[in-house]
């Protein structure tokens, strides 16, 4: 007599996927507000501090390249465990750093680990979560990431206020990452929790799960896929990449600005944490806006609000109430960013071949992550030759250019998605 397995519940993914994601994201976001302070303490100027902060997104970009192949070879769970180990090594290097560039090397390793962890958790959901629950599970995954982005800075603010040690958030990062690794390490085999999954052969004959095959295919023939889809990637891909420039600019410019106006570390982390709450509150609304009113209804307001906010910020450095302006614009940037949560992934899905999306999505991810990596480098370069105010204004101008590209190219490349009402 056979028994019918119990119906699947998203709660089954809470421990193997959602809790480690929450902890890993909290660890990553805990130290971001203090990178410029630590870099400055090690002898860096503002320009170099911006570049060092940007090593996180550069590491993510570089980590994107081999991660799919590695996950297909060692499995999703093992890849997440190795990612936590690499992140711990990066955090340890940052804690022990004696030069700005040693700090940058540690942050770069954390970026590589972040890329691998993100792909592995996506592959895990694809492999083990039934199709009927997949959209909700991916939405919940995004929510866990944003929850960690709230938890990290708020926890960092508390330990900074208690200790006065700028390195304390890196200790937090180590603690959160160890906790994520422990959850993954001591959980039972996923196939005992979710049931045995169907395995297939990849192009080399290696046995993989559906999720492992998907992320492996994303990286296969990357540059050939970029060349094949060059028109769309140079137009809409670059426009989406500029959204990532604005987002990365927000993550880097706000802590740099706080250092330049003499704000306390704990206050900076607290403001960034509260801004993350504002961002998080708009997470679900943005998806509804995109589905009901089209992609431009989310992307254009985001780029307009964030661009104008950066441009206004550039004029406030000498104002009497500079702290108040900083807080107000940090919240405005959070609102702008929250209005388009998921827009980059959604546009990529709109453009991808519905029968074989993985390779295009890999090229799309590489293009848009290039924007995220370029943002801090542009900011650091402009600060080096001019000032942080000019860097903020230039970021706003780039955002307005991207908005114009969105207005022109979204209707051309995604007419069906844009026509939704």
Each model region followed by its residue ranges:
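Juxtamembrane intracellular "pre-TM" segments in multi-pass secondary transporters
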Residues: 2-11, 189-236, 421
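Cytoplasmic helix-loop-helix junction between adjacent transmembrane helices
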Residues: 108-145
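Helix-to-loop junctions at the C-terminal end of transmembrane segments
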Residues: 63-75, 282-295, 383
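Helix-breaking motifs and short loop linkers at transmembrane-helix boundaries and internal kinks
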Residues: 43, 75, 96-101, 294, ...
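C-terminal ends and interior cores of transmembrane alpha-helices
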Residues: 86-98, 305-319
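Helix-loop boundary and gating motifs at the non-cytosolic
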Residues: 8-57, 234-239, 247-261
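Symmetry-related core transmembrane helices of the 12-TM Major Facilitator Superfamily/SLC fold
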Residues: 169-185, 392-408
């Amino acid at each position: 007599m056979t028994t019918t397995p119990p119906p699947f519940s998203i709660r089954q993914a809470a421990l193997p996927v959602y809790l480690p994601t929450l902890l890993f994201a909290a660890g990553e976001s805990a130290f971001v507000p203090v990178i410029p302070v630590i870099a400055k303490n090690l002898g860096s100027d503002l320009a170099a501090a911006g570049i060092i902060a940007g090593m996180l997104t550069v590491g993510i970009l570089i980590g994107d390249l081999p991660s799919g192949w590695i996950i297909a070879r060692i499995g999703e769970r093992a890849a997440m465990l190795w990612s936590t180990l690499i992140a711990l090594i990066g955090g340890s290097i940052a804690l022990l750093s004696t030069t700005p560039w040693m700090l940058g090397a540690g942050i770069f390793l954390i970026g590589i680990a972040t890329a691998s962890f993100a792909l592995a958790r996506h592959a895990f959901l694809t492999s083990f979560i039934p199709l009927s629950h997949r959209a909700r599970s991916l939405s919940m995954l995004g929510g866990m990431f944003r929850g960690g982005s709230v938890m990290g800075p708020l926890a960092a603010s508390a330990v900074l206020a208690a200790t006065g040690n700028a390195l304390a958030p890196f200790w937090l990062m180590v603690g959160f990452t160890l906790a994520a690794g422990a959850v993954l390490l001591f959980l039972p085999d996923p196939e005992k929790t979710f049931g045995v999954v169907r395995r297939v052969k990849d192009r080399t004959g290696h046995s993989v799960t559906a999720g492992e095959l998907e992320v492996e295919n994303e990286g296969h023939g990357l540059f050939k896929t970029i060349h094949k889809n060059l028109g769309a990637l140079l137009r809409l891909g670059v426009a989406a990449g500029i959204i990532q420039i604005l987002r990365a600019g927000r993550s880097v410019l706000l802590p740099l600005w706080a250092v330049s106006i003499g704000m306390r570390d704990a206050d900076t982390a607290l403001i960034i944490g509260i801004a993350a709450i504002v961002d998080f509150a708009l997470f679900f609304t943005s998806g509804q806006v995109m589905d009901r009113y089209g992609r431009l209804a989310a992307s254009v307001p985001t780029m307009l609000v964030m661009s104008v906010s950066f441009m206004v910020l550039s004029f406030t450095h000498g104002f009497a109430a500079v702290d108040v302006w900083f807080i107000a614009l940090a919240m405005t940037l959070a609102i702008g960013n929250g209005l388009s949560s998921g827009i980059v992934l959604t546009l990529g899905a709109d453009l991808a071949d519905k029968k074989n999306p993985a390779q295009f999505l890999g090229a799309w991810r590489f293009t848009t992550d290039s924007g995220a990596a370029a943002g801090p480098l542009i900011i650091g370069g402009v600060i080096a030759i001019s000032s942080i105010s000019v860097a903020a204004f230039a970021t706003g101008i780039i955002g307005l250019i991207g908005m114009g590209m969105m207005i022109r190219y979204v209707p051309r490349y995604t007419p069906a998605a844009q026509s939704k009402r």
